[in-house]
Structure formats: C-alpha cells, structure tokens
C-alpha cells in the first residue's frame, strides 16, 4: 500500500533568505501566480530561485520579476521557455491598491519571501512588505544572530556539565 504524504511534508518550494537580511519586513501577503505548464512542472522538480526577485505594480496589476524557473530538458519544443519571464500575481483589487499606496507614498518595497504549495495543487507566493535596511542595521542583526547561537551553545554546555 502506498503511504500518503502529510500536508506539510513538502509544502515549501523555495525561500528568499536574502529578503529578510536586506529588508525589514513589516507585513506579509499571500498571492497566487499565473504560470505556464512547463513552469509548473519545473516547480514540482524544485528548479526555482527567488534570490534576485522583486514585485512591482504597473497599471493596477502586480508582477513578479527576476524569479528564475529553469525549464526541464523534456520541455516542449513548440513553446519558448523563458526562465526569467515576468509572472503576474493574482491579488484582489483592494490589496493591489493598498500596496500601491504604501509603495508610492511611504517608500515600501515588495519582496517575495517564499513559494509554496497550497492544497497540493496551487502555487502561492508569500510577499513581504518592507523597507530596506541600512548597513549598520544589517551588522546589528548579524551580531544578534551570532549572540543567540553563542548563548545556545553555552546553555547546552551548562546542561551537559550539570
């Protein structure tokens, strides 16, 4: 008998680790993606890179640019596979208007944080609304992260000695 996968076993497809280092994320939004067939197949194989990706709003629609989806070798020959094709994000009009206002007036940036499967069949993108960090902010975050690691190491050593 075939064993079923749990719902959370492979829900995550890709994460943008640079986004949390480069930006201070204040809000997160879930959006759908308008994809082609070969892109879905490549995503199922895990050939996605979100590192140089960003979201922009143009004429009342949201688009994700810079997301690299590598085509499979077995992709169809009659379809032109562009790995860095701009993908349309599926958001409600009210969400797009709210985000556009924040971007234009308050200097926020939209950055994709992660890509994951919703209900096993739909690809969703988690978009972070944030502001860019300065160099000193990045250094503080690095020091804080290193301090947490060092503190955990010391605590573990104390438990072993006790």
UniProtKB/Swiss-Prot annotation:
GO MF term set: RNA binding
GO biological process: trans-translation
Subcellular location: Cytoplasm
Keywords: Cytoplasm, RNA-binding
PROSITE patterns, alphabetized: SSRP
Superkingdom, natural source: Bacteria
InterPro entries: SmpB, SsrA-bd_prot, SsrA-bd_prot_CS
Primary subcellular site in the record, as a coarse category: cytoplasm
UniProt xrefs under Pfam families: SmpB
Any one annotated GO CC term: cytosol
Family: Belongs to the SmpB family.
Function: Required for rescue of stalled ribosomes mediated by trans-translation. Binds to transfer-messenger RNA (tmRNA), required for stable association of tmRNA with ribosomes. tmRNA and SmpB together mimic tRNA shape, replacing the anticodon stem-loop with SmpB. tmRNA is encoded by the ssrA gene; the 2 termini fold to resemble tRNA(Ala) and it encodes a 'tag peptide', a short internal open reading frame. During trans-translation Ala-aminoacylated tmRNA acts like a tRNA, entering the A-site of stalled ribosomes, displacing the stalled mRNA.
Entry protein name: SsrA-binding protein
Organism: Shewanella frigidimarina (strain NCIMB 400)
Gene: smpB
């Amino acid at each position: 008998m075939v064993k079923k996968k749990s719902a959370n076993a492979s829900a995550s497809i890709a994460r943008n680790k640079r986004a949390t280092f480069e930006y201070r994320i204040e809000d997160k939004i879930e959006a759908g993606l308008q994809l082609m067939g070969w892109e879905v197949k490549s995503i199922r194989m895990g050939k996605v890179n979100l590192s140089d990706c960003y979201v922009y709003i143009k004429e009342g629609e949201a688009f994700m640019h810079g997301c690299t989806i590598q085509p499979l070798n077995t992709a169809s020959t009659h379809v032109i596979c562009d790995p860095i094709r701009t993908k349309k994000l599926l958001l409600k009009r009210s969400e797009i208007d709210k985000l556009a206002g924040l971007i234009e007036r308050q200097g926020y940036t939209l950055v994709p944080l992660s890509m994951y499967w919703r209900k096993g069949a739909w690809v969703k993108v988690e978009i972070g609304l944030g502001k860019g960090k300065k160099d000193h902010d990045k250094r503080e975050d690095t020091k804080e992260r290193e301090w947490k690691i060092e503190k955990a190491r010391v605590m573990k050593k104390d438990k072993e000695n006790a």
